[in-house]
């Protein structure tokens, strides 16, 4: 296999879709969702959300950028993990959630308790590779296929110079050093997407299925959130972890085996992969994690914002609409791309999101 630098694909990621059929009320406030979000003169006060720590860099840019269209709106976001974000949204603590995994059917049903009969919906906020990042001084561009990655993260392969790794890296001097696996300690959409890749692409080498909480049977180190795992891996010689690629920092990253090539992560092909993927009746997107397509990076997440179709009061509806319109606008997507290195959503995805967002209204 040869190294190939480019893009990505793969994963079953649900975009929940009550939004496709719900929302019959009028457009209360909000802009036209254009190049910069259109503006919303009715939006003011503080909008509170929480969720995926992978969104933290982009969220910082969005919180600042939304001021260009809603100068009196302040956005607060707690990056405590996707699971915590969805829980906080469903408990009424947050007006919106950021999540690297969509709500399941039970969560969608529960959303009616805070959102009314029309429930909640998902909008893709950005698309990002999941980097398999490691700390091994002087060793760059290690290649691994899916089976090898699964065996490393399950603890079956324990040394960096293991024969299975070495045979994929001819000419690269790998040390006789223990591998320390670092995983997320919290409920994590990044964990769910990473283990979904292992489940689909690695076959019997991964025995733990797709999970949001890392399997307790695996001996490994753990840390809270994206910053936590990157920080711990950076401080641990011989460590390997998985993280939103925008947060990988100075860690080296694995080139992932796809078909007859090894692919380094990049964002170029990400949005196109989503556009070309199959969409289920409920609005979920089925990405092919086991793809062998040339130049595709198969370890990927689509990060969502979760909103109510209807809010309990007009002020919150105006706040959410102004923020949501900015996030999916050309300016919002460009701002996130520049600050976080993610792939912007496509024009088709943006237009579909704008149609859903403009129908956000107040209950009653």
Residue ranges and their predicted role:
Residues 19-22:
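C-terminal motif of bacterial Sec signal peptides marking the signal peptidase cleavage site
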Residues 117-134, 255-306:
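Periplasmic-binding protein-like
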Residues 2-4, 8, 41, 172-177, ...:
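Extracellular/periplasmic juxtamembrane helices and adjacent flexible linkers that interface
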Residues 24-27:
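Bacterial signal peptide processing site
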Residues 60-72, 90-94, 102, 134-137, ...:
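Sec-exported extracytoplasmic/periplasmic mature domains
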Residues 129-133, 139-227:
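Extracytoplasmic ligand-binding site segments that recognize negatively charged/polar headgroups
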Residues 33-166, 232, 243-249:
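N-terminal segment of the mature folded domain
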Residues 86, 187-276:
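Ligand-binding pocket segment of bilobal, Venus flytrap-like solute-binding proteins
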């Amino acid at each position: 296999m040869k190294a190939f630098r480019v893009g990505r694909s793969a994963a079953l990621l649900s975009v929940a879709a009550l939004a496709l059929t719900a929302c019959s009320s009028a457009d209360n406030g909000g802009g036209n969702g254009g190049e910069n979000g259109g503006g919303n003169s009715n939006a003011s006060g503080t909008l509170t959300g929480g969720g995926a720590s992978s969104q933290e860099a982009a969220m910082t840019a969005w919180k600042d950028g939304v001021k260009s269209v809603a100068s009196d709106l302040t956005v607060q976001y707690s990056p405590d993990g996707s699971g915590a974000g969805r829980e906080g949204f469903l408990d009424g603590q947050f007006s919106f959630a950021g999540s690297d995994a969509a709500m399941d059917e039970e969560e969608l049903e529960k959303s009616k308790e805070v959102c009314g009969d029309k429930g909640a919906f998902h909008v893709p906020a950005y698309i990002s590779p999941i980097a398999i990042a490691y700390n091994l001084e002087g060793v760059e561009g290690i290649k691994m296929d899916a089976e090898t990655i699964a065996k490393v993260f399950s603890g079956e392969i324990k040394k960096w110079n293991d024969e299975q790794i070495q045979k994929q890296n001819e000419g690269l001097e790998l040390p006789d050093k223990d591998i320390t696996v670092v995983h997320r300690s919290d409920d994590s959409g990044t964990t769910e997407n990473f283990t979904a890749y292992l489940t689909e692409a690695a076959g019997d080498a991964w025995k733990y299925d797709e999970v949001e909480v890392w399997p307790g049977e695996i001996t490994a180190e753990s840390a809270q959130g994206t910053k936590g795992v990157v920080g711990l891996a950076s401080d641990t010689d011989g460590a390997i972890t998985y993280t939103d690629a925008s947060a990988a920092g100075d860690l080296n990253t694995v080139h992932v085996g796809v078909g007859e090539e090894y692919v380094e992560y990049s964002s170029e092909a990400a949005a196109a992969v989503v556009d070309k993927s199959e969409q289920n009746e409920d609005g979920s997107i089925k990405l092919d994690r086991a793809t062998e397509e040339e130049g595709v990076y198969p370890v990927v997440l689509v990060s969502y914002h979760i909103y109510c179709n209807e809010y309990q009061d007009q002020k919150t509806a105006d706040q959410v609409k102004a923020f949501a319109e900015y996030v999916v606008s050309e300016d919002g997507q460009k701002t996130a791309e520049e600050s976080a290195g993610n792939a912007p959503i496509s024009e088709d995805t943006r237009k579909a999101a704008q149609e859903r967002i403009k129908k956000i209204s107040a209950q009653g």
